[in-house]
Every structure is written in structure tokens, then in C-alpha cells.
């Protein structure tokens, strides 16, 4: 079996023409550019706004966490200081330095006819103490026991002694 190829006898040096290039889709090109431009125009501000919002949220979170931490420590120290300051009683020596007097007769200067610690009335000749800062009056034995445990007035919770900087605790008022 043999194959024959027809030959016309001419030799041509020109290459056969290449197929034409495919036509570019010029109708969709402006729409694509416009679409990409609008996406960039919208997405960049949205991304920047979201980034700023996240940073602001984190900043507020850290600020309030730090503020809460400081307040909690401050309240804890204040509570501990107050508990130490008011719950610790006075020394017997300090209590003995408080003003005392013998009860003679009912008077408005004593504030009442009863000692609020023992809920008993004042009697003629009993020793009493008048607290210097608030002026409340109690039986001497009652208030002495109270002040050894707690350094404040049993009625108004005012401190019996005032702390002055650079000095030790000292009673206020005169000592009788």
C-alpha cells in the first residue's frame, strides 16, 4: 500500500498565514475597571473604619480593665486601713487620759440620762467619761471596756483620738 502526495512543483517560501488573534472583549473592559475601582473605593474606607473601631474597642477595654484594677486595689486598701484604724482599740493608758467626771445631776450637757453601752441610767456620784470630739457621755467602766476593743464612739462612730502628722495619737479636749 502506498500513499501518494500530490505535488504541484512549486516551492513557496512564505509561511502559511497564522490565524488571526482572538478579539479582546472590549465591551466588558470599562465595566470591569469601573467595578474594581468602586470595590476599592468602598472597601478601603470600610476596612479602615473597621480597623479603627477594633482599635478603639481594645483601647476602651484595656483602659476600663486598668481603671477597675486600680479602683479595686484602692477600695481594698481603704477598707483594710479603715478596719485597722477603727477596729483596733485604744491602749488602757490612752483610755485613762480621757476626760472623766462624777455625775451629779441630770443636765442637758450630758446628752441623756442613760449610758447607751449598758443601757442603765446615770446615778449620783458615778464616774463618767465625756468623749472629747463628739461630747457623748458614758459610764467610765462601760466606755473604757468599749474603747479598749474599738477606738470609736459607740453612738456616732467618730474617732476618739485625732491623728496629727508627725505626732502620736493624742486625746482631743481637756482632761479633767
UniProtKB/Swiss-Prot annotation:
It catalyses: S-ubiquitinyl-[E2 ubiquitin-conjugating enzyme]-L-cysteine + [acceptor protein]-L-lysine = [E2 ubiquitin-conjugating enzyme]-L-cysteine + N(6)-ubiquitinyl-[acceptor protein]-L-lysine. Pathway: Protein modification; protein ubiquitination. Its EC number is 2.3.2.27. Keywords: Membrane, Metal-binding, Transferase, Transmembrane, Transmembrane helix, Ubl conjugation pathway, Zinc, Zinc-finger. The chain crosses the membrane at residues 37-57. A zinc finger (RING-type) spans 115-157. SUPFAM superfamilies: RING/U-box. Its main location: membrane. Residues 1-26 are annotated as: Disordered. GO terms for biological process: cellular response to hypoxia; protein ubiquitination. Induction: Up-regulated by chitin. Gene3D superfamilies: Zinc/RING finger domain, C3HC4 (zinc finger). Pfam families: zf-RING_2. SMART domains: RING. It is a single-pass membrane protein. InterPro entries: Znf_RING, Znf_RING/FYVE/PHD. The keyword Transferase applies. It is an enzyme of class 2 (transferase). GO terms for molecular function: transferase activity; zinc ion binding. It comes from the Eukaryota. It is found in: Membrane. GO terms for cellular component: membrane. Belongs to the RING-type zinc finger family. ATL subfamily. The RING-type zinc finger domain mediates binding to an E2 ubiquitin-conjugating enzyme. This is RING-H2 finger protein ATL14. The gene is ATL14.
Amino acid at each position: 500500500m502506498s500513499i501518494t502526495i500530490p505535488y504541484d512543483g512549486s516551492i513557496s517560501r512564505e509561511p502559511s498565514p497564522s490565524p488571526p488573534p482572538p478579539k479582546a472583549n472590549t465591551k466588558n473592559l470599562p465595566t470591569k475597571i469601573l467595578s474594581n475601582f468602586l470595590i476599592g473605593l468602598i472597601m478601603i474606607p470600610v476596612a479602615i473604619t473597621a480597623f479603627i473601631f477594633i482599635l478603639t474597642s481594645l483601647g476602651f477595654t484595656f483602659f476600663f480593665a486598668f481603671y477597675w484594677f486600680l479602683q479595686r486595689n484602692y477600695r481594698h486598701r481603704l477598707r483594710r486601713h479603715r478596719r485597722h484604724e477603727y477596729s483596733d482599740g485604744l491602749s488602757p493608758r490612752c483610755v485613762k487620759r480621757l476626760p472623766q467626771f462624777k455625775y451629779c445631776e441630770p443636765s442637758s450637757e450630758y446628752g441623756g440620762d442613760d449610758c447607751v453601752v449598758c443601757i442603765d441610767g446615770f446615778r449620783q456620784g458615778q464616774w463618767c467619761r465625756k468623749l472629747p470630739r463628739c461630747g457623748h457621755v458614758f459610764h467610765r467602766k462601760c466606755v473604757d471596756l468599749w474603747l479598749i476593743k474599738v477606738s470609736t464612739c459607740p453612738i456616732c462612730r467618730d474617732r476618739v483620738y485625732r491623728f496629727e502628722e508627725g505626732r502620736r495619737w493624742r486625746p482631743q479636749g481637756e482632761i479633767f
